[in-house]
Amino acid sequence: YGRRRHPKKLTPLAYKQFIPNVAEKTLGASGRYEGKITRNSERFKELTPNYNPDIIFKDEENTVMNQWPGVKLRVTEGWDEDGHHFEESLHYEGRAVDITTSDRDNSKYGTLSRLAVEAGF
């Protein structure tokens, strides 16, 4: 049977570092822009809301809790319709998310970014 992998050392991302190292709206990072989703569009029905006040963010592996016990992942913005992002922002499609930690300790953001990359975001 398979052997258990040793967890690899997580290197925090540097400020303004991207994985992949390309802009958010390039094909290599996120695919083609599919168009803004409005509340009245059919695609809006495909978005999955989270109304549970006890859940800040889905973290099945508890990576944030394992890294920083007692700290939760905090989503500050997901799908958006307010027009405060650039025209083809992935926030308008529900494909971008802005995250922080519940303690708002910005010294954790590099490692948080790495955890997001490792989780497939």
Curated annotation (Swiss-Prot):
GO biological process entries: animal organ development; cell development; cell fate specification; cell-cell signaling; central nervous system development; neuron differentiation; proteolysis; regulation of gene expression
GO CC annotation: extracellular space; plasma membrane
Alphabetical list of SUPFAM superfamilies matching this protein: Hedgehog/DD-peptidase (SSF55166)
Binding positions for Ca(2+) 1 per the UniProt entry: E60, E61, T76, E77
Binding sites annotated in the UniProt record for Zn(2+): H91, D98
Post-translational modification: The C-terminal domain displays an autoproteolysis activity and a cholesterol transferase activity. Both activities result in the cleavage of the full-length protein and covalent attachment of a cholesterol moiety to the C-terminal of the newly generated N-terminal fragment (N-product). The N-product is the active species in both local and long-range signaling, whereas the C-product has no signaling activity.
Record InterPro entries: Hedgehog, Hedgehog_sig/DD-Pept_Zn-bd_sf, Hedgehog_Signaling, Hedgehog_signalling_dom
Binding positions (Ca(2+) 2): E61, E77, D80, D82
Sorted UniProt keywords: Autocatalytic cleavage, Calcium, Cell membrane, Developmental protein, Hydrolase, Lipoprotein, Membrane, Metal-binding, Palmitate, Protease, Secreted, Zinc
Localization, UniProt: Secreted; Cell membrane
Main subcellular location of this protein, as a coarse class: secreted
GO molecular function: calcium ion binding; patched binding; peptidase activity
Function summary: Intercellular signal essential for a variety of patterning events during development. Signal produced by the notochord that induces somite patterning, dorso-ventral patterning of the brain and early patterning of the developing eyes. Displays floor plate-inducing activity. Binds to the patched (PTC) receptor, which functions in association with smoothened (SMO), to activate the transcription of target genes. In the absence of SHH, PTC represses the constitutive signaling activity of SMO.
Family, as annotated: Belongs to the hedgehog family.
Assembly: N-product is active as a multimer.
Domains: entry comment: The sonic hedgehog protein N-product binds calcium and zinc ions; this stabilizes the protein fold and is essential for protein-protein interactions mediated by this domain.
Protein name: Sonic hedgehog protein
Source organism (scientific name): Tanichthys albonubes (White cloud mountain minnow)
